[in-house]
């Protein structure tokens, strides 16, 4: 969906300085993801549509909020843990989520690794001694099947476990084709980590995409982000967790929002997040309870946020 179509469908976008916002962070709006959303408060629109607030500096802004720059031994590679290596296959996404923690910085120049960089990152992963490689981006499913499978095959057999961190089943569910699913199944163990923030994102098309993966034996887990005005209440998070478990998707992490420049409107104070999580814990079973985590700017890696009965 282009700017003209989006502005016609969502009249409040007329007040948005589209050029300025998109020059800082791209805008991409698939019709399928937006679905029938039409009100400013719809969670899909809040997280996908550009807003002038993205241009406003905030005292809490941290350009690299999870400390990836200092933990990047090569372009397109992040190494925070001895047993894991993260490879960024691309900077492209099907939707550019306005709260994204990598919106201000990603290791690597351009939209995709060069051939030389691609070879170097796979060589690094193979020699790393890691037990898991995380394929991320951008969105790793914004690359072709051939490119994705080349990344998986390129680190095997040295690295046994592959994780594909993607929003494609949610934002572009037609990407989850029979060919892709069979390729992932044949390369097991491959875990798919999806990113659902609100029950409204679980459309019939998304359900079908998730089912294709799970039915083929590809394990699927979810990571959400606690977002102001989107899911910052326990009832919404509980509904999401229950819906995920019904779809055989494990609610793995609830991330405290990272303070990257441009996403201040989505941030939730930590004390409030703790209170919300304490309430959530009373509303769902252990199976449906994600771990509430924070990824600090020192690059040491995420940790579980301690929460007592009152928050």
What does each model-identified segment do?
Residues 26, 73-102:
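N-terminal pre-triad scaffold of radical SAM enzymes
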Residues 107-108, 137-138, 164:
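Surface-exposed cleft-lining segments at the edges of enzyme active sites
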Residues 103-134:
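Conserved alpha-helical substructure of the radical SAM core
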Residues 33, 93, 97, 164, ...:
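Conserved, mostly hydrophobic/aromatic
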Residues 88, 134, 163:
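Conserved beta-strand segments that form the floor/walls of ligand-binding pockets within enzyme
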Residues 119-130, 141-284:
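Conserved AdoMet/S-adenosylmethionine-binding subsite of the radical SAM
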Residues 20, 275-311:
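C-terminal accessory regions of radical SAM enzymes
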Residues 1-80:
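Flexible, acidic/Gly-rich N-terminal and inter-domain linker regions that tether
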């Amino acid at each position: 969906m282009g700017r003209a179509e989006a502005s016609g469908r969502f009249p409040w976008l007329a007040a948005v300085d589209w050029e300025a916002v998109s020059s800082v962070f791209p805008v991409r709006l698939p019709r399928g993801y937006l679905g029938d959303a039409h009100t400013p408060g719809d969670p899909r629109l809040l997280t996908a549509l550009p807003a002038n607030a993205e241009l406003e500096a905030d005292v809490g802004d941290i350009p690299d909020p999870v400390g990836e720059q200092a933990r990047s031994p090569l372009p397109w590679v992040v190494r925070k843990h001895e047993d894991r290596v993260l490879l960024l296959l691309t900077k492209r996404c099907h939707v550019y989520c306005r709260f994204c923690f990598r919106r201000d910085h990603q290791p690597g120049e351009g939209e995709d690794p060069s051939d030389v960089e691609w070879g170097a990152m796979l060589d690094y992963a193979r020699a790393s001694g890691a037990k898991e490689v995380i394929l991320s981006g951008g969105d790793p499913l914004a690359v072709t099947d051939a490119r994705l499978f080349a990344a998986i095959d390129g680190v095997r057999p040295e690295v046994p476990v592959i994780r594909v961190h993607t929003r494609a089943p949610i934002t572009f569910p037609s990407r989850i084709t029979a060919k892709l699913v069979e390729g992932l199944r044949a390369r097991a163990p491959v875990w798919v980590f999806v990113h659902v923030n609100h029950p409204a994102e679980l459309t019939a098309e998304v359900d079908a995409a998730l089912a294709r993966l799970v039915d083929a034996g590809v394990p699927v887990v979810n990571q959400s982000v606690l977002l102001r005005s989107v899911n910052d209440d326990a009832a919404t998070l509980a509904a999401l967790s229950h819906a995920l478990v019904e779809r055989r998707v494990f609610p793995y992490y609830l991330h405290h929002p990272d303070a990257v420049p441009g996403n201040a409107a989505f941030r939730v104070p930590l004390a409030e997040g703790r209170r919300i999580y304490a309430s959530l814990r009373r509303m769902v079973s252990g199976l449906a309870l994600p771990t509430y985590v924070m990824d600090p700017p020192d690059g040491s890696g995420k940790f579980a946020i301690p929460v007592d009965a009152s928050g």
